[in-house]
């Protein structure tokens, strides 16, 4: 009887696995079929970047009439209207002389299935785009963010003829695109401490992320070099800004989060602690370990990596205060800060909150009698224990106020046996840590320096494109890979070279993270990426040529 | 009696000259005095870039109340309202918590003296800005363009305090600025043939020129590599564009001219001829000399410098057609083009029209029997005679349709004895040609390559700043120096590195051309330029650091 039951269970498992396998195979086969139907090669498909999950394309073309509009056939929202209007203005910048007829495309039906606009980890970005003829063309999304992604695809399909002043879609109709991202977390990290970026520049970055179908801006807002974040609970912190004008106000942060929402981009804040804290001390000198910059000691503390001193009576209050303030909760630690009406974010702030944890230079604590006394009192034996205790407090506080903590891999390396499983680990050194962390049940975000850091002279789109974040991760753990990020560490980057460092390398990461793995290869990526780059340039996003440097000689953007 | 009369005339001349000298001296002295009053050094003055013609500054500060507005005390115009609204939004991007009182600045009176909005060479950009207290602060301009320049100065005076959410003007009140440009022609040349720049990018360039108090965009629109200009009279010319989407439509050009007007920037078109014409021939192959690319001949024609063939029956009709079409006249040479309703520019196009004339490679004509036969028929002995005859026809046609021809110095070198004096010569090789041209009575624009071309690796702001366009020009000819231009030749420049090549070098040129010569020295330029660069970055104009390259390490924009 037991054996029979076991056999039935076994049979069921086999059936389920086979079913999944067949379904997946059909999906893959369908896709591949559609790519090759009528002897069309991949290169004959319209150059959509990142490539969609599923696409089926015919050979017909259609003119778009001057009466063309988006026709909402579902309930509408303010954000949906704003999005449609934005893309209408992006697409139709020229005169259109084509009168509507039964042979022209006069409308695209828009079907928004849910009015839920909450932007949080895993939000729905899927969409379905069908273009056949005038009556049967539609764009469907579960959320307005799916509609945004679909409109970006629609934008990329439309061309303009300067000779007869007409818009058209060429050689790909009827068209069915069923699209959704491969990974839920796809972003770029921007460091605004080493150089300050104006709000206008950050908004332009957000806009550009949306064109790439990214969904997250990881904002590494402060670091050792400057503290540009204006805090109401600890107003002296901005004394650590580069200058009196290189600062982000509440008003600025609200604009950035609002613009993120309008572009389907989560704004994930990082307040890096306890390392990289020199800038904190300009306003509150007691935050740093005593004697850290004593020039007479043999063990030197690196100037820009000095960490907070966990034994300082200010360290926890200020750290907790910042977490509360910038996650929009009312757990404020500062008794002077009880103006709830000025609560910054409410529901708009992301559910992931990054607290750094990288590169804690323990030797900086070595000169401080205060720390050593405090270690004795608290029964902490090593500086590693000090770091661990501090970080655990931060993590627990974040969990208490309802946020999911994200930390750089150093934290995992330091004490993964005691690290809560809710923590998401961001990998930047090596894939081996990704394997190790997932084997230990941690969710990870991939941002491995030699592939996805964007500031190096050797960074380029092919290198970035070829890195697969699930590499050597066991199949049962692949669901723990949440996605990845390109990173703009800004020692050698400021506004003047930001976009040429961001793109096209980040665009390659965008496709790696959005498109099916069997599509993400170099087969026809280059020409599609060149086309996509042209579409970025057209919209004022100043991507470098594919050589990742400056232009070598006169060329079309389609060959650069 | 005759001697007496002569003496009286002589005396009068002496009195007038003395009068001018004394007046100028007083003006200079006043300015210098104001710079040193109360032992204030130049560096204590507010960091306005480019420095104003006359400024007088006190030591007081003032808060700007949240009720602040621009109050028009004269007649108004749509453009004036749009300009005030633009600067209001540029300045007031943050919360302002300051209530109005008798001690705050609550308004700036705006006095527009003339509604004349015609943008042409020499238009009035002067303004007077007085800020004392709430009742006696005003900005006065003869034209709306003077108001624009004054608002830019006002913008640069205002700071924000992130600690108490207030706007203020610091340590310089009462303030009187009497400002006007030193030269009437101050611009940047943009080459859109070697790389195509999107309309959005060109609009951003125009916006940036206005912040620099430039007044001209010299648009080198076509060249050998591509022909992005969509012509209704000769529609096949756009076959020479890089691609079917790297083209400027009428609609685009109108947007660019309209935006120029909104920023006080003349859009001066250049249609370079007869050299650099390879791209013309894609649509009209017969325009080029027969046999130009014959590989068997010993004298080679450089691929990208092949000129038009003046003996082609198409050369003059197409050249004249383009001049007519793009200067908005109705002297169209193409009988098929008589749609006057589609006239492009009407009054909005600039009165200066550039027709190139540089680098005509005569040897490219050497293989063509057609040219040689035609030379015999027309009694032309040398290829130089061919070029001269063609250019004279172009110049006369331009004068006939009411435009002032501008040509590169090659034309002056080729036949200055027969060149009409109406022609403006743009100098790019050497100051000696500037001296020679002015000695021969020609007006010049200075754009000498080794100082004011912006694409070289050695280009930098100090080099550009130190070049004085009137150098060694005799005093009696200085009025013939109309101004100058920084030049973006785009073989190695595209949208991705455009702004870091444009700025800060062009900003240095902007001050050289706007500010009094006795002020234009390196004394306090660096810190003012750094401040100005910060103000550009804030507005999304991504100037390189002052090293003209990428950032060397983490820094404030005020030290970069």
From Swiss-Prot, chains A, B:
Q: Name one GO cellular component term.
A: lysosome
Q: Give one Pfam family.
A: Glycohydro_20b2
Q: Where is the active site?
A: 359
Biological process, per Gene Ontology = carbohydrate metabolic process; glycosaminoglycan metabolic process; N-glycan processing
> What span is annotated as the signal peptide, if there is one?
1-25
Q: Which GO MF terms does the UniProt record name?
A: beta-N-acetylhexosaminidase activity
- Please state what class of enzyme this protein is: hydrolase
Glycan-carrying positions? 59, 69, 81, 99, 161, 293, 346, 366, 436, 472, 547
Q: Which InterPro entries match?
A: Beta_hexosaminidase_sua/sub, Glyco_hydro_20_cat, Glycoside_hydrolase_SF, Hex-like_dom2, HEX_eukaryotic_N
- What is catalysed by this protein? Hydrolysis of terminal non-reducing N-acetyl-D-hexosamine residues in N-acetyl-beta-D-hexosaminides
Enzyme Commission number(s) from the entry = 3.2.1.52
Please describe what this protein does. Answer: Responsible for the degradation of GM2 gangliosides, and a variety of other molecules containing terminal N-acetyl hexosamines.
| Protein name, UniProt field | Beta-hexosaminidase subunit B1
Output the lineage of the source organism.
Answer: Eukaryota, Amoebozoa, Evosea, Eumycetozoa, Dictyostelia
């Amino acid at each position: 009887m037991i054996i029979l039951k076991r056999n039935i269970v076994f049979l069921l498992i086999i059936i389920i696995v086979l079913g999944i396998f067949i379904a997946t195979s059909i999906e893959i086969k369908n896709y591949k079929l559609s790519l090759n139907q009528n002897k069309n090669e991949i290169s004959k498909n319209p150059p959509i970047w990142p490539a969609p999950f599923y696409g089926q394309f015919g050979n017909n073309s259609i003119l778009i009439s001057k009466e063309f509009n988006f026709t909402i056939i579902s309930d509408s929202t303010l954000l949906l209207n704003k999005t449609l209007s934005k893309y209408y203005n992006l697409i139709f910048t020229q005169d259109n002389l084509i009168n509507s007829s039964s042979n022209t495309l006069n409308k695209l039906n828009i079907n928004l299935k849910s009015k839920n606009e909450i932007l949080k980890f895993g939000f729905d970005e899927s969409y379905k785009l069908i273009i056949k003829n005038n009556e049967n063309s539609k764009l469907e999304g579960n959320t307005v963010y799916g509609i945004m992604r679909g409109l970006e695809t629609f934008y990329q399909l439309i061309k303009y003829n300067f000779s007869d002043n007409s818009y058209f879609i060429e050689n790909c109709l009827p068209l069915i695109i069923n699209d959704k991202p491969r990974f839920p977390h796809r972003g770029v990290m921007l460091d605004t401490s080493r150089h300050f970026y104006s709000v206008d520049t950050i908004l332009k970055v957000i806009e550009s992320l949306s064109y790439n179908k990214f969904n997250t801006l990881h904002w590494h807002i402060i670091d050792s070099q400057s503290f540009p974040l204006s805090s109401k609970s600890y107003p002296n912190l901005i004394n650590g800004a580069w200058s009196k004008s290189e600062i982000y106000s509440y008003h600025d942060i609200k604009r950035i989060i609002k613009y993120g929402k309008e572009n389907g981009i989560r704004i994930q804040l990082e307040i890096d602690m306890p390392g990289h804290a020199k800038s904190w001390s300009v306003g509150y000198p007691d935050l740093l370990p005593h004697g850290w910059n004593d020039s007479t000691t043999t063990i030197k503390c690196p100037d820009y990596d000095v960490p907070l001193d966990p034994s300082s009576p200010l360290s926890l209050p200020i750290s907790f205060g910042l977490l509360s303030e910038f996650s929009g909760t009312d757990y404020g630690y500062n008794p002077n800060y009880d103006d709830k009406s000025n609560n910054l974010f409410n529901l708009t702030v992301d559910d992931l909150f990054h607290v750094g944890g990288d590169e804690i230079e323990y030797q900086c604590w070595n000169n401080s009698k205060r720390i050593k006394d405090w270690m004795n009192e608290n029964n902490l034996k090593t500086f590693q224990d000090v770091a661990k205790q501090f970080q655990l407090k931060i993590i627990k506080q974040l969990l208490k106020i309802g946020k999911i903590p994200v930390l750089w891999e150093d934290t995992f390396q330091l004490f993964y046996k005691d690290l809560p499983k809710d923590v998401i680990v961001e990998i930047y050194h090596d894939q081996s840590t990704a394997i190790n962390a997932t084997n230990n049940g941690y969710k990870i975000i991939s941002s491995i320096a030699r592939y996805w850091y964007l500031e190096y002279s050797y960074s380029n789109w092919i290198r970035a494109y070829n890195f697969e974040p699930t590499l050597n991760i066991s199949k049962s753990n692949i669901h723990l890979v949440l996605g990845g990020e390109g990173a703009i560490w800004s020692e050698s980057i400021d506004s003047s070279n930001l976009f040429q460092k961001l793109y096209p390398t980040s665009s390659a990461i965008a496709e790696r993270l959005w498109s099916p793995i069997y599509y993400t290869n170099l087969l026809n990526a280059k020409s599609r990426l060149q086309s996509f780059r042209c579409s970025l340039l057209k919209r004022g996003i100043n991507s470098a040529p594919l050589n990742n440097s400056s232009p070598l000689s006169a060329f079309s953007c389609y060959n650069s």
